[in-house]
Amino acid sequence: MKIKVILLTFFIYISYFSPLWGQTTGKITDTKQQPIEGATIVMQLPDSTYLGAAISAADGTFTLEQEPDSYLLIIQHLLYQTRLIKGKTTDAGIITLEAKDYNLEEVVIKGEKPLVKVEDGRLGYDLSVLSEKQAVSNAYEAITKLPGVQEKNGTLSLAGANSLTIVVNGKPTTMTSEQLETLLRNTPVNRIEKAEVMYSAPPELHVRGAVINVVMKRSHDYSFQGEVSTNYQNRYFSSGGANGNFRLSTPKLTLDVMYGADNIQTMEYTELFSRHTLNDNVYEITQDEKLSSKSWMHNVRTALEYNINEKNHLNVAYTGSFTPDGHNRSIADGSFQQSSLDKFTDNKMNNITVLYSSGIGLEVGGDYTRYTSDNNQTMFTQLSDKNKSSYTLTGGQRIDRYSIYADQKHNLTNNWGIGYGVAYRYAKDYDFQTYNNVTGNIQTENTEAKLNEQTASFYFSLNKNWATGTSFSVSATGEYYTIGNYHKWAVYPQASLTYLKSPKHIFQLSLSTDKTYPGYWDMQSSVTYLNGYSELQGTPGLRPMTNYNLNGTYILKQKYIFGLFYTHTSDYFAQSPYQATDRLALIYKNTNWNYMRMIGANVILPFSIGNWYDARLTLVGMQARQKCDQFFDVPFDRKKWMFVGTLDNTFKVGKNLSLELTGNIQTPFIQGT
């Protein structure tokens, strides 16, 4: 009740005391009405007092945070004549620049768009530039081409970051990372304005740590466009799908509709060797396992953007993902046991998001996700001593997540700014599994559990921008978190400094803190059998881990990136295998360690040869230290150096045909325990 009163009071406060701060916008074009990117727009008062500056985006648009009664705009670009514009309205309109006449005889100057731009401490990438020479078909694939970003087994990582979060349009969502990945895989690249990479997310994003913010394009003209695409891949099985989308836009309204259907079939082989000691005897267990999965996934999204007026906007979006009749099969054959496991699943996800943006710097939004999962599985096992066991299991999960937030920004004099906001998130989880038809010597336990999770947070931020491009920001977020009988107050500081010696030399330093909570299913006292030897156990009382991250980055010529990083994670938890001491069983279980610490460096070097070859070399070197005093009966404290090298190559073999080849090498590293 106390949290609700605080939130209500804060909403009233920000809605009543927010002064009328606005923005001045416009668009820069050439004489052929083509947008001009990279033009510098300087705003002054009529008495020449400096107010602020901006750089035009890829579509020629610019935004200045100031809104004086009258002003003077100075527009400059290396290839165009400087122009002065006087204005009194918040819409500066379309400003046309005339090209300079250099009179260079038989000389062709080809410009290269910068790979990265720094805006308010954020590393901004134009995905259309990155995907010009890359074989990408959707927004998710374009994100994997960002410098320092790698994908492994469906998980994205950023070089030098402990973890990575993806957000859309700078706002949180109650969708999981897997559900958000599905959304981006069904989003065309041409719907994305840019991707912003931050090693220390500002508090108004309501996430912490490293973040990639995917900014969708806005349309303010009369247009209709659509796209149909198909994809095919073969990894033992043939898989593929089809996607369709269209956008209808007017100056007041934009409607986006997308639908995709994918036939997903995968195959994976694993080999296991376990030297298991039991009752002073050593058993050498070998096992080969074949894992296959087949399913159809249907994805739909409908988004509506309504421009109430020039300064006020309302966005509503619905996202659905449905995977009925999924079938997973595991067949294991080894020296200790033979087993087969069939699992049939039915998963559904529905999400709705609402966001209101006002001209006074206030944003209010909410998000709701409903997720249901049902599964039925059957397992048969025969041990080497001819003993047999079997069971059938019915299980499921029901999750409801709600979130609301409000953010307020104020632009002060001399390019100072402040921000503050609140957020509240509530989640309700219900898990169950019931064993039936149990035969043989197998331990089973029916479980049914309910969890309620609440998170309330508030923050205050301060930032400063200089005309040279240098900027800094600091913030502190207070959070109250509760789940079950666990209650915790925490404060998360954040700081970021960007120094521009010149556009060719950019330095950035960031500090962030975060807390990572275990999944709901991981905290249940359940046992799930993977085969006749391996099993998965829950961990009631699993503690969240706290992350501290320090990153330093140097960007040379807006394309070459060099970084140093340090991360320390207290109460680190990971799912690790453990050989049971009372029976022949390999137990996979999440446990808390003392800490996990990493220190290292990364280098990103893009290069090209003519118009036919484009490449990027990524090098990462780091030392990891892992310590755990209470890992069952085998405590450990170990260090290990690791080096990773990745070379991404794109060959232009035709006007509309490209070939990609990626090479990766990694030195041995610690896996599990």
Question: Which ranges hold each PLM region?
Answer:
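Extracytoplasmic beta-strand/coil segments of soluble accessory domains associated
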Residues: 140-175
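A short, solvent-exposed loop/turn motif at the edges and junctions
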Residues: 44-49, 72-86
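Outer-membrane beta-barrel signature, preferentially recognizing the C-terminal barrel domain
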Residues: 397, 515-564, 568-570, 586-600, ...
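Short, acidic Ser/Thr/Gly-rich low-complexity loop/linker segments typical of extracellular
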Residues: 47-61
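N-terminal periplasmic accessory domains that precede
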Residues: 93-96, 139-142, 180-182, 196-197, ...
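Face-selective signature of the C-terminal outer-membrane beta-barrel domain
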Residues: 253, 297-323, 341-493, 498-504, ...
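Short, acidic, small-residue-rich periplasmic hinge/interaction motif at the N-terminus
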Residues: 42-44, 76-80, 92-131, 151-153, ...
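Short acidic/polar hinge/loop motifs at secondary-structure boundaries
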Residues: 173-200, 244
